[in-house]
């Protein structure tokens, strides 16, 4: 597997993406959409929304959450098999000064939340956060961890573009086969464009964790925010064109790209 991944990195990445697309249908078979007949025959309890822990468990029992949980398991299993833990970014950020590069995505998060939060209580917030966390961990481990490590030997800019493209294609394929095309295109665009910023952070901080932090914070903010018309348009602009531009800015020339890498270089041992 490692020989194939290193010898044919692009085909390896396409194969993993296609495998995940197939897993989508397995997850939908596990949690099928139940057809609704005569609602008058349903018990009253059916119409009572769950509360507390019941709400959290109910929201987590979904095809999407199962899909990303399986993606996490697949990514970790392949990283263990290939031994790519350090190269995939499972290390401490060695470029601590570059943590300031999180400022722009976190500023977008703050803008997203500027109109307030729409929630029915702490349980709903916890449920949304856990669902978002599983999804962002799955996407980052696969695309900015495993696939990034396979592609980055050809340069960080190429790795950013290809991993973002594959992530966007996976999202549009999964969403378009189960929902309306406009929503699929919107989510795919956010995924593709966000990948530029998360991938650039991955390179500049030498770790996967800052990207996970930024991705989770933004996805959670979008999930709970109350967006007005103007704020919505501004957030969409910043999280698409803005994230692409920011990611390319962080990797704009060889001297800037040199301030980053896969992992922290090990100091030589003097004997």
Set out the residue ranges of the language-model regions.
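Alpha-helical transmembrane segments
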Residues: 8-24, 98-110, 162-166
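Juxtamembrane helix-loop-helix connectors linking adjacent transmembrane helices
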Residues: 36-42, 46-60, 64-66, 76-141, ...
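N-terminal, membrane-interfacial amphipathic/helix-forming hydrophobic leader that caps
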Residues: 1-86, 196, 202-203, 221-271
């Amino acid at each position: 597997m490692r020989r194939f991944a290193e010898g044919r990195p692009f085909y390896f990445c396409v194969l993993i993406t296609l495998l995940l697309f197939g897993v989508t249908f397995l997850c939908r078979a596990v949690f099928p959409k139940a057809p609704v007949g005569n609602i008058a025959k349903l018990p009253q309890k059916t119409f009572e929304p769950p509360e507390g822990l019941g709400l959290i468990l109910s929201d987590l029992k979904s095809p999407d959450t199962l899909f990303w949980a399986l993606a996490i398991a697949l990514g970790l299993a392949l990283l263990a098999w290939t031994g790519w833990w350090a190269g995939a970014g499972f290390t401490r950020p060695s470029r601590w000064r570059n943590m300031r590069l999180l400022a722009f995505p976190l500023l977008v998060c703050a803008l997203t939340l500027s109109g307030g939060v729409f929630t029915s209580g702490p349980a709903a917030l916890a449920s949304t956060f856990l669902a978002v966390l599983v999804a962002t961990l799955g996407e980052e481990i696969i695309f900015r961890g495993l696939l990034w490590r396979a592609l980055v030997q050809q340069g960080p800019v190429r790795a950013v573009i290809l991993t973002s493209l594959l992530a966007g294609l996976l999202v549009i394929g999964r969403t378009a086969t189960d929902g309306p095309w406009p929503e699929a295109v919107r989510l795919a665009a956010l995924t593709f464009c966000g990948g530029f910023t998360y991938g650039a952070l991955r390179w500049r901080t030498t770790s996967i964790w800052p990207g996970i932090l930024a991705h989770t914070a933004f996805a959670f903010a979008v999930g709970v925010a109350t967006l007005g018309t103007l704020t919505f348009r501004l957030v969409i602009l910043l999280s698409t064109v803005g994230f692409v531009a920011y990611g390319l800015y962080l990797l704009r020339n060889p001297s800037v790209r040199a301030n980053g890498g896969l992992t922290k270089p090990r100091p030589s041992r003097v004997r």
